[in-house]
Design a protein with these regions (language model features):
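Juxtamembrane intracellular "pre-TM" segments in multi-pass secondary transporters
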Residues: 186-221, 411-419
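Cytoplasmic membrane-interface "Motif A"-like loop-to-helix N-cap segments
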Residues: 59-74, 275-289
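C-terminal ends and interior cores of transmembrane alpha-helices
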Residues: 70-89, 287-305
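Hydrophobic core of transmembrane alpha-helices in multi-pass small-molecule transporters
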Residues: 79, 90-108, 307-325
Length: 419
């Protein structure tokens, strides 16, 4: 249910409405808006990179994963509601609220992933991960339907009229969190070491243990590179759509189409990923990403001014397929490689890799788009996925799982001896 709840922030604040509102209304200058949005989004992700391993390690040692998940969610809800205060020209207020809101959201996403190994097995982890991802897209579809109907009935077609939707996003998140708060139990502690160590000691310890998981390191490097592209597309999807002439209510409908495609893909992944294999699944979706971004680049190079709107609608299906599949399959790899007693720490590193990728990718894409041009930015985006695919070919899933099992056996021996 938490995957369903936080879709309101993902869709309305990160992807769809707030980026356009910020660029066109709060800033009021397209070039400056692209630059400031990339700076704000990347800045928040850089801070998440610093916090992720600390939060993950502390949550593991104090057995407070649920508390961290709920706490970050509540903070994100409050800050999301405050976005209604961002009026025309007040871009600095928008950044002052969005940056901490995104930090809370991203830290919660990391913690949510750490629950995965405890509710699945190595055989079912792909399916369970995809089910959670699918719930998120179902929530997205319902929310977008509400927004589309509201925009149509109330005539809220222009970005200047979108501030009430930020309150709807906060309310949706708050209501959707209630089942998690009431019914999800704190996972049973598996790490009984003293909790008095400093944060620096925890990070050094986590890094020392990570060194024993070579395949996880290889995957994180690959994920880091193709994560540049995924995070960039999430942050700039609405802005790119607007560049192709998709605006107002049509922008909401485009996002609805993208979400339907992504949700359908997540359902397919939930059913077939464990059968097809995580490796084949990830390689397939990276191929879809490369084809989609390369097509956008070709269109921009051949039709630089006023490209046909229908082209972006068509390519949006490829983007939706990529979004729906690459996230859940990537999360499955981390769960597959993580020993159970260090899940929050290792998912913290996964989150750190993803957020650092987003920080670098969003910043570089936004600045290139603002100061060099759309074609150069799209070429950069295509390169992210291509290099990520090449690096992923070096990851050995079986070897990575054996590394996790060895770590679990060693931990059981140490725990049994009372060390």
């Amino acid at each position: 249910m938490y995957d369903l709840a936080n879709q309101s922030f993902t869709l309305l604040i990160i992807t769809l409405l707030f980026p356009i509102y910020f660029k066109d209304v709060a800033v009021g200058n397209p070039q400056k808006g692209d630059s400031l949005w990339s700076l704000g989004a990347s800045g928040s992700l850089f801070l998440v990179v610093l916090l992720s391993p600390i939060v993950g390690s502390v949550a593991d040692r104090h057995n407070k994963r649920k508390a961290v998940l709920v706490g970050t969610g509540v903070c994100c809800v409050i800050l999301t509601a405050l976005l209604v205060l961002v009026r025309p020209g007040a871009w600095w207020i928008g950044l002052a609220i969005f940056i901490p809101a995104n930090i809370m959201y991203q830290l919660g996403e990391n913690m949510l992933g750490s629950f995965l190994p405890g509710i699945s097995t190595p055989r079912t982890i792909g399916k369970i991960s995809a089910i959670g991802w699918t719930m998120g897209y179902i929530g997205g579809l319902l929310l977008l339907a509400v927004v589309a109907v509201g925009a149509f009935l109330l005539g809220w077609k222009d970005p200047e009229q979108w501030r009430p939707f930020f309150l709807i996003a906060a309310l949706w998140f708050a209501i959707g969190m209630i089942p998690t708060m009431l019914f999800v139990k704190e996972p049973v502690a598996t790490n009984h070491r003293a909790a008095s160590a400093s944060a620096g000691d925890r990070i050094r310890s986590a890094i020392a243990h990570l060194k024993n998981h070579k395949q996880l390191i290889r995957f994180l490097v690959s994920f880091f590179v193709y994560g540049f592209g995924v995070q960039t597309m999430i942050m700039f999807a609405a802005i790119l759509a607007a560049d192709f002439g998709i605006e107002g209510t049509r922008l909401i409908l485009f996002t609805l189409q993208l979400t339907v495609t992504a949700g359908g893909t997540a359902i397919v992944v939930a059913k077939y990923q464990d059968r097809l294999g995580i490796r084949a699944t990830i390689l397939s979706f990276l191929g879809v990403w490369i084809a989609s971004c390369a097509t956008l680049l070709i269109v921009k190079l051949t039709i630089p001014v006023d490209p046909p709107e229908w082209i972006f609608w068509a390519i949006g299906n490829g983007i939706g397929i990529g979004l729906g599949g690459i996230g859940t399959s990537s999360r499955s790899v981390v769960g597959f490689f993580a020993p159970k007693h260090r899940t929050a720490e290792f998912f913290g590193f996964w989150g750190m890799s993803y957020k650092l990728a987003g920080a670098i990718g969003v910043l570089s894409f936004g600045q290139v788009k603002a100061w060099v041009g759309d074609a150069a930015a799209l070429a950069l985006l295509t390169g992210f996925f291509a290099v990520g695919l090449v690096l992923f070919l070096r990851v050995d899933l079986r070897s990575g799982r054996r590394e996790a099992m060895r770590a679990e056996r060693a931990h059981r021996v140490i725990t049994h001896r009372g060390v």
